Amino acid sequence: MTAQAPEAASPVLCARLENVSKLFGSFAALRQVSVNLEPGRCYVLIGENGAGKSTLLRILAGLLRPSSGTIRLFGDEEPHEARARIGYMSHAPMLYDELTGVENLRYFASLYPGRACLEPAEALREVGLDPTLNRPLGQYSQGMRQRTSLARVLLSVPELLLLDEPFSNMDVESAHQMVDLLAGFRQSNRTIVITTHQREQAAPIADWVLRLKAGRVADFLPGSPRL
């Protein structure tokens, strides 16, 4: 099944996947997935555990290679070639509990020598956090931890944001704050791909909803973004 938005005169696609499959031994995590992602849109991936959502996200991020099929980003780049233009936030925040938010970001910024990056304090402000907060991350609420993780992703000023379960373990208020943040990024023409079990939480910003079932695209439906 080929999943794509209706054809229209538009900029170069953010991503094009054609018949992408991924095998782990004899298990097919993805089966002939074809999808086009347009720039400046928000795509929400839903499906049961094991449907292939996180696998698809990791392939887009260049962290996994497909077993077959082709994927091109920003025209004609392979994911590993486009890594500098991609921001990937994993389900488990990659942060250090003993460091403050700004100390965490300074460390991760040091891993990108020579690459244009946001200042750590600026990245924290973008997600609504106070960079002067002198508290170790281990004392942050889950919502603050998730926003710090998102700030880490923003350091490299990515054009494509890949967010694996960004609303995980959040209370309702924190989830609403995250949705508001993502709405702002979407309006700045970033492309966003979200995996979630809570479709209703992402509904206000979803341009398209892609439902995976047993590694295949079962539905690719227009959303009703309100933000």
Per-segment meaning from a language model:
Residues 69-82:
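Conserved ABC transporter NBD signature motif
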Residues 172-174:
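Helix N-cap at the start of a conserved alpha-helix in ABC-type nucleotide-binding domains
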Residues 106, 117-132:
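Conserved ABC ATPase "signature" region
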Residues 161-164:
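Catalytic Walker B motif of ABC-type/P-loop ATPase nucleotide-binding domains
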